[in-house]
């Protein structure tokens, strides 16, 4: 489960930005195409934050839906995998416009 190491990194990043202040809430963006399972991050958060400035903090996850762009017809549309054909023209080789995110959006501090 790579979500454990990802969650540990999120906690470390938050501690750096908290600059010694207690964190009460973390808002994390997770893209649908990022390969990260949101439920696993939620499960790992309590264990990873124990004994840190984030202990007891609320974790709010915001899912970013996948959006692709077609190189042939330049259309943009929702995607749920990286290997879908364009629904407009059937071309492959889509570029991801959104959905690969994994980042801390907000920290609430005491």
From Swiss-Prot:
It comes from the Bacteria. It holds the Pfam family HypA. Gene3D superfamilies: 3.30.2320.80. Zn(2+) binds at residues 70, 73, 86, 89. InterPro entries: Hydgase_Ni_incorp_HypA/HybF_CS, HypA/HybF. Keywords: Metal-binding, Nickel, Zinc. GO terms for molecular function: nickel cation binding; zinc ion binding. GO terms for biological process: protein maturation; protein modification process. Signal peptide: none annotated. Ni(2+) binds at residue 2. Involved in the maturation of [NiFe] hydrogenases. Required for nickel insertion into the metal center of the hydrogenase. Belongs to the HypA/HybF family. This is Hydrogenase maturation factor HypA. It comes from Geobacter sp. (strain M21).
